[in-house]
């Protein structure tokens, strides 16, 4: 099966560059969730084009990416892509990583339990698991689900409420979209503990690119949410 992002790598990066304030807001959340990772072994699951990684010191970051188009760009940006494929099928070294994170990739995974279980097995005891993504229950989640089902952003239901430059429809349509509570429950079922949360994009979607937002604690209001838990 063709990976969902094959053929859309350039479009993905261009969208973030055109929505720079939104990108900077998500980047601040990304940086806050990761914290200081110097000297740690870190794995990015669904590393994409390595756009976010290119904005931080990513010398210790390894990546797994289903799309060869995206992964090739990540490699050029200095991410050590160790495998092309899905995390569910990955054969990772056990108890090897200090941090494993999914930045925007869980929304393209059908079986969260299987994916998160693979990550847990590869984490060191006490290692951190981080999931950053658009919650299904957020305004962005509703907008993407509606556009996916309508097959377009150009519809009377969405007129007057859309951002100027919405996320590419092809990528919305490929998404599964999970709620934050669903992800938390899966992680708890797997035995993760010491949960922490932070969020950004608190404005409605049509206003989120007006200003850069700082990440704030919690998960009940944001359009982009980080869940942090320990093995």
Predicted regions and their residues:
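Short alpha-helix
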Residues: 173-197
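A short glycine-rich, Lys/Arg-flanked "PGG" loop and its adjoining helix->strand segment in the class I
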Residues: 113-128
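Core SAM-dependent methyltransferase catalytic element
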Residues: 190, 210-231
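Conserved class I S-adenosyl-L-methionine
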Residues: 1-37, 51-55, 70-73, 130-160, 201, ...
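Class I SAM-dependent methyltransferase SAM/SAH-binding core
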Residues: 43, 48-89
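A short SAM/SAH-binding and catalytic strip from SAM-dependent methyltransferases
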Residues: 99-112
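A short acidic, Gly/Pro-enriched loop at the edge of an enzyme's catalytic core
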Residues: 88-100
